[in-house]
């Protein structure tokens, strides 16, 4: 229903300007339901939250007379005593009473509410209004024609301005209404029942304008336009001509507009303070109408009652709420929105002007945008002399996680150059800043991964609590027991490997290597040879043969077990080494068994060694057994998880190559099963297992809060993850880790760090991105501000002057390269070979790639060079070559190379073209086009790299073509042939395009022709011609790829679907497929895809 509140009173109404209250004074000449003749001033509270439809009475005071007019003004005195302002009542006896509404609704006695009594007028006061600008000014007008201005700065002592000149004259007539100008505080308007309207200037103390219509109709009410200073609306209560006329003081010869709709005289009127296009009127025809002052049409009408309304007002605090007092003895509070259906004929309902009020327009507005943006708008004050209100829009960068932004900037700066020194410094700083022991351990280990070559193994072992000797002699294993060092076994069997003579002599001092049994002592009853040369070697230091023989005889005589000795000797005499070994093992003489087995050959030595190792109970012998049998995995499963540091140190010392990664993974899995999470994480780090490591770290996001926000925890996690990824060179991540990158990129984007967010997303392999991640990547890419192109357009490449006829040597710098750098493709290449000078590619610093000094280019002259581009290798945290056991080949044959991994590879990274430039001629990284191959680069041999966690791929220089050497013969001095122009739509060879792709060529050719014609064709200006030529070159490069079959099946299929959509003029689908190509096949299609989109947009515009 339209009426939302009400009260049963026949009263004039005044609404509080700044509080939810309504004053009601008993109306003169009206009879309420009680037929009472008393007069009262009452205060009602406008409580719209209450379900009660009746307004609650909060204050009441009797009045000496009834009211003709009631006004409520703001506090003009500035005193807290009058915080709710003043209520002025124009009485029928010509007096004006002033009340303090705060006293009426407060705890003070109501008798104190009457604060002033103004007695000047000699007739009923029908004109009464407070100045909207200077609220201490009150204007009053009565039937005597006088207009009085009161200063109520002190309400208890009001002052009266001198009477206005001309006021009270016979021509003025009975004042029916007065109104202050809403913009100019000294301008006052009055109207009278004789049809005259007068405009007064208080500064001049006289009227400045007066006017009337041609028939001088009675004027009952007038209102100033709230927005237009010079416009005033005057209404007539003449039943024969109940019109409303809008006058402009700049031309009073005739009204600006006339409003017709009432059938009888207009009694009351008020202009909407919230929307100057709405005017509310009530008349004696029992209609209350809301007008559109711009069109003079009816917008809404209140429901009709049993009797007409005589007083209407807009509620200033809530737009669209109005009050209406009727002769039915009711005061109703209405919502103008609920009144829209009234007063419009049913058959004309659809033609009624439906216009949203201005209060529906938000004075201010704000909306969050992608990329940490906040857009806001607010109304701007209209220019002087105009009524139109303009809006201003502001774009703000909103940062809610300031600590995250600062930490991200610091972290990005630390890893921007990518050199190991800065990364080590970063890890050391993080280790010092954290208070968690686990974090200190983690960052300490990450720091070791960036140590210099040859020192990382030592650093890791030291980090685990072990100390290596200063000098490692012959790479022997230190730290093991002295028993292991005492085992010096040499193989002298005929089928054994050749060893140094010094080792042979060290093992058997009496053995000259010719005949073992010549030196074997004879039995007591056997004659002893007297030949010295047959008994001992020439370098033996014994003085006489007799002394030696005597000693040996004495030793044999002192034997405690002659039976055992005889059995051993018999076996040795006949060469039955196995029997001799078995006898020794039975007698628990393992040392003797090992010595004899070593002479008996490799098979006997290995079996005897295994028996010895199995029977030995010493803990360190388990380590020896694992090393001898190359079974380091057994150490992982047999040693207690409590000694994980010792186990990891053993793996670091002896594991080789990929074995290190596998064994560290196994040890980490065992530690995780045992509940030692920190140790497991450290082992996973050593193994280079990024996914498993980050999976464990990610649990802190849900488990660890400690008053820290999710963004801070995620920042900690991503810093460790990125450092670990940089160390391992890993770019293949699991779906859960990709989701983590997505969450982090979203947070960065929400803080306005779009460029940084894109860098993190580029870490991920674009081939396996989820649809959500692809959308986020595309959204960030489109939202980021484009880079400013500061270079001149054109296919240019900086060159340096080089001497001629140099040897084609290649220096391969051993520097850290960016494992995540995007590989940009070259669109085409020259089709002939000339002597080439190799130049390094221009490098663009990124957060994962250091800015490296350019090595000096070297000329190389090759008629048909071959490519040496290699894909990036994933490297793990591999220790350097373990120290080999002395004479290790006697234990086992080596199964792996002595180097843990290879040295720098010679990867060739072409230079990405700058914005607005065409890619220069050069080889393609992924081979999209048949290009001349790069010359073979030979890098110097690299030594053992050590416990190095990162790959160090070199950057192969790219070749450019120098001028011909001046020393060549005359034929060679001729100008070189011009470069082959790039293929275009017209010149590209499409003879070998498969049949199912022929429609693609036809569709794209048609699209190019239509777009060229739209751009002006041959008549196009220079700018448009450049665009046409660019379109032709880009499509020509695509045609070359289709012709050579050098395009992936996925990209070709999507391209075919796109062309089918173009043939059907379905540009929306075509553009959607273009977005899919952008997100999934960008590396392959980036050269021509943007051009294709531009042409499709142009074609769609032409269709429209």
From Swiss-Prot:
PROSITE patterns given in the database record: WD_REPEATS_1, WD_REPEATS_2, WD_REPEATS_REGION
Keyword Repeat (UniProt): yes
GO cellular component: cytosol; endoplasmic reticulum; Golgi apparatus; plasmodesma
UniProt region (Disordered), positions on chain: 527-562, 782-811, 851-874, 892-931, 952-994
Cell location: Golgi apparatus; Endoplasmic reticulum
Biased composition (Acidic residues): 549-560
Pfam family, one: WD40
SMART domains for the chain: WD40 (SM00320)
InterPro entries the record matches: Sec16_Sec23-bd, SEC31-like, WD40/YVTN_repeat-like_dom_sf, WD40_repeat_CS, WD40_repeat_dom_sf, WD40_rpt
Compositional bias annotation for Low complexity: 959-977
WD repeat extents: 5-45, 62-109, 120-160, 170-210, 214-257, 261-301, 304-344, 662-707
Biased composition (Polar residues): 786-811, 863-874, 892-908
GO biological process, alphabetically ordered: endoplasmic reticulum to Golgi vesicle-mediated transport; protein transport
Main subcellular location of this protein, as a coarse class: Golgi
Keywords attached to this entry: Endoplasmic reticulum, ER-Golgi transport, Golgi apparatus, Phosphoprotein, Protein transport, Repeat, Transport, WD repeat
Phosphothreonine PTM sites in chain numbering: 526
UniProt-listed PANTHER family: SEC31-RELATED PROTEIN, SECRETORY 31, ISOFORM D
Oligomeric form and interacting partners: Interacts with SEC13A and SEC13B.
Family of this protein: Belongs to the WD repeat SEC31 family.
Function: Required for protein transport from the endoplasmic reticulum to the Golgi apparatus.
The name this protein goes by in its record: Protein transport protein SEC31 homolog B
Organism for this UniProt entry: Arabidopsis thaliana (Mouse-ear cress)
